[in-house]
């Protein structure tokens, strides 16, 4: 299982997330959630294969820029407890 408590933000300059054509409307809730899922899927896949998780930093930065902190904390708690509804 992934250790969601040990996640640290990547170093370097943070910028505004670029436009994502999958989410053209102003409402970015789905974009936030999808990037959260993509980040955890990326971590899971790359860790399992023994590869660097550095490419996953993009998703981390995007969901941390778009998602409210309370949502992220709630989702991480659900993952930790094994009750997260999303498919990771």
UniProtKB/Swiss-Prot annotation:
Record key words, sorted: Disulfide bond, Membrane, Mitochondrion, Mitochondrion inner membrane
Cysteine disulfide links: 32-67, 42-56
Subcellular location: Mitochondrion inner membrane
Residue numbers covered by motif Cx10C motif: 56-67
All copies of domain CHCH, residue ranges: 29-75
Membrane topology of the entry: Peripheral membrane protein
Motif (Cx9C motif): 32-42
Matching Gene3D superfamilies: Cytochrome c oxidase, subunit VIb (1.10.10.140)
Region (Disordered): 1-22
Superkingdom of source: Eukaryota
Tissue: Testis specific. Weak expression in thymus and heart. Expressed in cancer cell lines.
Functional pathway: Energy metabolism; oxidative phosphorylation
One BP annotation, GO: oxidative phosphorylation
Pfam family of the protein (one): COX6B
Gene Ontology cellular-component annotations: mitochondrial crista; mitochondrial inner membrane; mitochondrion; respiratory chain complex IV
PANTHER family named among the record's database cross-references: CYTOCHROME C OXIDASE SUBUNIT 6B (PTHR11387)
Record's function text: Component of the cytochrome c oxidase, the last enzyme in the mitochondrial electron transport chain which drives oxidative phosphorylation. The respiratory chain contains 3 multisubunit complexes succinate dehydrogenase (complex II, CII), ubiquinol-cytochrome c oxidoreductase (cytochrome b-c1 complex, complex III, CIII) and cytochrome c oxidase (complex IV, CIV), that cooperate to transfer electrons derived from NADH and succinate to molecular oxygen, creating an electrochemical gradient over the inner membrane that drives transmembrane transport and the ATP synthase.
Quaternary organization: Component of the cytochrome c oxidase (complex IV, CIV), a multisubunit enzyme composed of 14 subunits. The complex is composed of a catalytic core of 3 subunits MT-CO1, MT-CO2 and MT-CO3, encoded in the mitochondrial DNA, and 11 supernumerary subunits COX4I1 (or COX4I2), COX5A, COX5B, COX6A1 (or COX6A2), COX6B1 (or COX6B2), COX6C, COX7A2 (or COX7A1), COX7B, COX7C, COX8A and NDUFA4, which are encoded in the nuclear genome.
Family under the similarity heading: Belongs to the cytochrome c oxidase subunit 6B family.
Entry protein name: Cytochrome c oxidase subunit 6B2
Organism, as annotated: Homo sapiens (Human)
């Amino acid at each position: 299982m992934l250790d969601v408590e040990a996640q640290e933000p990547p170093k370097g300059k943070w910028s505004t997330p670029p436009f994502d054509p999958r989410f053209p409307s102003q409402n970015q809730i789905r974009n936030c959630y999808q990037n959260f899922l993509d980040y955890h899927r990326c971590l899971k896949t790359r860790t399992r294969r023994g590869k660097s998780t550095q490419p996953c930093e993009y998703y981390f930065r995007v969901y941390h820029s778009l998602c409210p902190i309370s949502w992220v904390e709630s989702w991480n708690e659900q993952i930790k407890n094994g009750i997260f509804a999303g498919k990771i």
